[in-house]
């Protein structure tokens, strides 16, 4: 396990060291010491979370690949503020697990899943929380059900490019809160659910035409 800048407090260090001595601390993301140790460890996979942009030498230190999760359906919603922008663009709320490359959320996709919106939501924040939890669950599932069993996760290339998302401003969030209360997540969930296939999504032209 590798902990970077925001996890260097002594109390947090001690918490992790209670469970394992195999914990490494880095002073700087993408720093030379981090790159050297990753190379020395000769790892197959690097799993990241909220880590910022990785430079190519760090990505290449993992023999098979670097995995990350994303609280939206790739390739339709990349960047920030992706849950609100997804709903705004007619994309169902969901989550993805993917291989990291030098682009922003552009790596090959491993798995995607819709947020279950069959029950009502009352704010955008609720949907965002569900998407965050689902993203983490998908990543853990990939680790335990695939990598943990000696399988190398599939790669589904992102052949389609969509406009990057940005954070919603205060007024946009208020508008989206109202749309959420009116059932936008549930409507999109019903619309996208038939396109789901086990482990992936239909990326046909029909699907593309659904995205505004």
Feature names for model-found ranges:
Residues 1-212:
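One-carbon transfer enzymes
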């Amino acid at each position: 396990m590798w902990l970077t800048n925001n996890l260097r407090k002594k109390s947090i260090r001690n918490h992790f060291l209670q469970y394992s001595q195999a914990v490494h601390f880095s002073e700087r993301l993408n720093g030379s010491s981090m790159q050297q140790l990753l190379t020395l460890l000769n790892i197959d996979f690097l799993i990241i979370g909220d880590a910022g942009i990785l430079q190519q030498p760090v990505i290449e230190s993992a023999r098979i690949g670097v995995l990350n999760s994303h609280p939206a359906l790739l390739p339709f919603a990349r960047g920030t503020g992706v849950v609100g922008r997804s709903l705004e663009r007619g994309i169902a709320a969901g989550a993805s697990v993917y291989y990291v490359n030098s682009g922003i959320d552009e790596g090959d996709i491993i798995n995607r899943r819709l947020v279950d919106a069959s029950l009502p939501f009352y704010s955008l924040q609720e949907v965002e929380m569900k998407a965050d939890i689902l993203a983490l669950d998908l990543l853990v599932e990939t680790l335990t059900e695939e990598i943990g069993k000696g399988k190398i996760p599939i790669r589904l290339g992102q052949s389609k490019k969509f406009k990057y998302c940005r954070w919603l401003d205060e007024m946009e969030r208020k508008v989206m809160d109202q749309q959420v209360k009116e059932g936008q997540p549930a409507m999109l969930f019903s619309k996208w659910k038939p396109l789901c296939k086990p482990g992936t999504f239909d990326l046909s032209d029909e699907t593309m035409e659904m995205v505004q």
